[in-house]
């Protein structure tokens, strides 16, 4: 499948094809996110807290 973009990747593992935690707050978690947490910012936003494959640094539209 296509990898979700991520503006700001946080912790990544050290493999050649790293899995990362994305720090972005999004209206809904991407399909395949294993640990989606709601973040209260006044409007319901979500953050994927599991290690996933992303296109890091790709501007998200």
Curated annotation (Swiss-Prot):
Tagged with keyword Thylakoid: no
Gene Ontology process terms (BP): negative regulation of endopeptidase activity
GO cellular component assignments: extracellular region
One function term, GO molecular function aspect: serine-type endopeptidase inhibitor activity
Pfam families xrefs: Bowman-Birk_leg (PF00228)
InterPro entries reported for this sequence: Bowman-Birk_prot_inh (IPR035995), Prot_inh_BBI (IPR000877)
Tissue and organ distribution: Expressed in bulb (at protein level).
Keyword Lyase included in the entry's annotation: no
Superkingdom of the organism of origin: Eukaryota
Site residues (Reactive bond for trypsin), renumbered to this chain: 14-15
Cystine bridges: 5-60, 6-22, 9-56, 12-20, 29-36, 33-48
Primary role: Serine protease inhibitor. Inhibits trypsin (Ki = 41 nM) and weakly inhibits chymotrypsin (Ki = 410 nM). Does not inhibit bacterial subtilisin.
Similarity section: Belongs to the Bowman-Birk serine protease inhibitor family.
Name of the featured protein: Bowman-Birk type proteinase inhibitor B5
The species this protein was found in: Hyacinthus orientalis
